[in-house]
């Protein structure tokens, strides 16, 4: 079984760069407080790094 990580959106996407909004949607995050579980892959880690100021990650 692949390792998963929990990602929670902590800040609003309003007024952010369109690329960052698209990254949040790509992760499956829609609103503040929304939490999703994703596989721990390099692609997902890169997306998290791009929007690290808007999300909280739990291993």
Curated annotation (Swiss-Prot):
Task: Please provide, alphabetically and separated by semicolons, the GO molecular function terms listed in this UniProt record.
Answer: structural constituent of ribosome
Q: Which of UniProt's keywords are assigned here?
A: Ribonucleoprotein, Ribosomal protein
What GO terms fall under cellular component here? cytosolic large ribosomal subunit
PROSITE patterns reported for this sequence: RIBOSOMAL_L30 (PS00634)
Give the domain of life: Bacteria
Give a yes or no for keyword ATP-binding in this entry.
no
Q: Name one GO biological process term.
A: translation
Q: Say yes or no: keyword Ribosomal protein present.
A: yes
Checking CDD domains in the record gives: Ribosomal_L30 (cd01658)
- List the Pfam families hit by this protein, alphabetically: Ribosomal_L30 (PF00327)
Regarding protein family, the annotation reads:
Belongs to the universal ribosomal protein uL30 family.
- Stored HAMAP family: Ribosomal_uL30_B (MF_01371_B)
Oligomeric state and partners? Part of the 50S ribosomal subunit.
User: What is the name of this protein?
Assistant: Large ribosomal subunit protein uL30
């Amino acid at each position: 079984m692949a390792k998963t990580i929990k990602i929670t959106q902590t800040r609003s996407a309003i007024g952010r760069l369109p690329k960052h909004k698209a990254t949040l949607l790509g992760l499956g995050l829609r609103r503040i407080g929304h939490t999703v579980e994703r596989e721990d892959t390099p692609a997902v880690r890169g997306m998290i790094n791009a929007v690290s100021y808007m999300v909280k990650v739990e291993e």
